[in-house]
Every structure is written in C-alpha cells, then in structure tokens.
Curated annotation (Swiss-Prot):
EC number: 3.6.4.13
Principal subcellular localization: nucleus
InterPro entries xrefs: DEAD/DEAH_box_helicase_dom (IPR011545), DEAD_box_RNA_helicase (IPR050079), Helicase_ATP-bd (IPR014001), Helicase_C-like (IPR001650), P-loop_NTPase (IPR027417), RNA-helicase_DEAD-box_CS (IPR000629), RNA_helicase_DEAD_Q_motif (IPR014014)
Gene: RRP3
Domain remarks: The Q motif is unique to and characteristic of the DEAD box family of RNA helicases and controls ATP binding and hydrolysis.
Domain Helicase C-terminal: 229-373
Protein name: ATP-dependent rRNA helicase RRP3
Entry's family note: Belongs to the DEAD box helicase family. DDX47/RRP3 subfamily.
Domain of life: Eukaryota
Keyword annotations: ATP-binding, Helicase, Hydrolase, Nucleotide-binding, Nucleus, Ribosome biogenesis, RNA-binding, rRNA processing
Motif DEAD box mapped to chain: 150-153
Quaternary structure (record): Interacts with the SSU processome.
Gene Ontology process terms (BP): rRNA processing
Amino acid sequence: MEFGDLRIDESLIKTCQEKGITRPTEVQRQVIPAVLGGGDVIAVSQTGSGKTLAFVLPIVSHLLQKNRSFYCLVVAPTRELSSQIAECFNMFQATGLRVCLLVGGANFNVQANQLSKRPHVVVGTPGRIAEHVLKTKSFRTERVRKFVLDEADRFFEQDFVEDLETIIPSLREKRQTLLFTATMSDEISKLSSSILKRPKTIRTAEKYETVPALKEYYLFVAMKWKNSALVELLEMSQGMSVIVFVSMCVTARVMSLALARLGFCSEALHGELSQEKREEAMRSFKESRFNVLVCTDLGSRGLDISHVDLVINFDVPKSGKDYIHRVGRTARAGRSGTAITLVTQYDVEQIQKIEFTLEKKLEEFKMMKKNFGTICARIEEAIQEAQETLKEERKRNRRP
C-alpha cells in the first residue's frame, strides 16, 4: 500500500518523499483512513512505529480542504515530544500551515502573542496548555475540531490529570478525539470511555512488545568493569549514532564530559538543563554534530530521530515499560537497530523482571574483555577530571 492509496493530498506525499518517507508504516496504514473517516480513534502502537505522522497527515489533509484557525490541539506529556510533533507538522509549512508550540520553560507572553495570530495547530504539554486556557483570551479552544492525546499512558505517570480536567471541558462537544498509547491500562480505559464516543480501536502492538527489527542483547560485566565496557562498546561503534541511557542527571553530566575527554563526540540531555539547552542538544544530535548522546529517561520518549543505530542501557531500566521506551529510540519506522543493556552482578534480578515482562530472553552480547584493565585507567582518570570540572562550575555559579 502507498500513501496515495490512503487518499492523502499529493503535495503532502511529495513532501514526505523529499524527507525520505516513501511508504506508510503499519500504524499509518490503519490510522490514516480512520482519522480521515472522522470518528474517534484509540491507537495502541509500538514506540517508533511512525504514529506521529499517522495523525499529522490526515489532519493537514483536512486543513487543506478547509482553512480553520485553532483546528487541532495536540497534548503530549513532555516538552521534547511536543517539540518533535510540532516539527512534524512544520514539515508541511509550505502549505501555509501555522503551528504554535506551548511548553514550559519558554516565555509565556511570547506564546500568548503567537496564539493571538490564530494558528491552525497548537501542540504542547498539559501544564502550559492548561495555563493558557485559564489566562489567554485569544486561545480559542472552543474552536478545536481535532483533539489528540499522544502517549496518553504517560499522563498518569506524571500526574497530569488535573491539567486535563482544565483543558477538556474547554473544548467543543462536537470534535474528533484521537488517543495514542504504547500500552493499554485501566486508567487509559477509564479516560477513553469518558472523552471518546464509539471509538475505533486499532492495535498494531500488544502490551510490552518491542519491534521485530530491533536486535536486543545484554552484556554481563562485573561492576568494576562497567565503565570500561561502555568505552569498549563505543569504540566498537565508531561512526554510529548512539544513545547511552543512565539513571541520574549527575551521571549523564559526568559520563558525557568523561567520554568527550576520551575523544568521543558526546553531549548530555537531562532534566537539569534549560529548555533552550535541551532543544539545542536534540537539534545538534539530529544534525549529527555529535554522535553520542548520554541521557536520562527524560529522553526515552519524544526523541524521534531516524538515524539512531545503537542504544546502550548503561544503567538497567527500572521496569519493562521503561526498557521498551528506551530501546524504542532505535529501529524506528521500519529501520533496524541494536540495543545492549549492561548487567552487573547487582542487576541480575532486575533484568530477569524485565525479561519476564517482555516474555522473552535477551541474547547475551559476547565481548573480549582483555583490554578492560587498560581502558579502566583511562576512563577513571577522565571521570575524575569531569567531576573536578563540574565542581568548579558549581563554585562559579555560587559566586555572587
């Protein structure tokens, strides 16, 4: 099946082709006709399946037929994901499409001014959207005809329910609501029954499933050699685009600096960065200005980067669900990819829980460890230097 078979406007198909998107993914083949049909939709799909374009294309197609301001409102759980969705809509700005991004960390008054210019599409996080609903008169949510909740399962993890209770009543009763989620839960079922009317349910993934194109491994390594194993993996992956997941912001900062000292082109992405610096890090990684991104779970959703070759879980994820969202940064939209999880003697029970959730065993990654001793001295020295650098930074920042 081609995009033309889905009744998508030819100009939009041409734009997709220019971006290297030539054939619809499974979720796009199923969701696009349902959205064009006008009814409410629940889509349960794997991360990396191309779901963003699955709602962007039919919504822009409708806008080409009838130009309306405040036609679509998209709510996403993180600033990063909101930015990615806005970027996806902006692929089609040659059509005259106006998109407004509402996220925290950006100037509220500037956003209010953008809303006064009557955008066609508004994308943002629940907290900032709710704030504009209450304070910005030019935000005409009663005009919204397409309401999208993306990665809806995340709203309950981050307690956005109160914000949704502000946003949803402000919308018109007669609208199309689209709900996308990686997993189905009791909370999602309850939410969908309260805001959707006779929805069409589309499942392109069962609960806790990774994509077939993803090769998944674990690397068992003693705790004392964990840093060495990371360096060895990165040296084996020269020229590849790599995301390294860690559990804490301080680890992301230290490891990123340490790896840079060892000659790797690395940057960090974590929750202590300003919104401007987060966006710059993501943009630079996307543009291949560096190839190793060290990040916390902040980046495990919302990073829609097509060229990620390898995900390394330096720290084992807390749950099977977190594992899926991390490794879902590679092998996206039909491309292949690899995920390797470092497992120390202290992580065995946790990785077994993840395997139980996934209902499969990860394959062991075989690696020669004879160089670990030499590597260890280099990485430990680099880590010590990185820690000293951060210590000096903190001192400078504390000075009046």
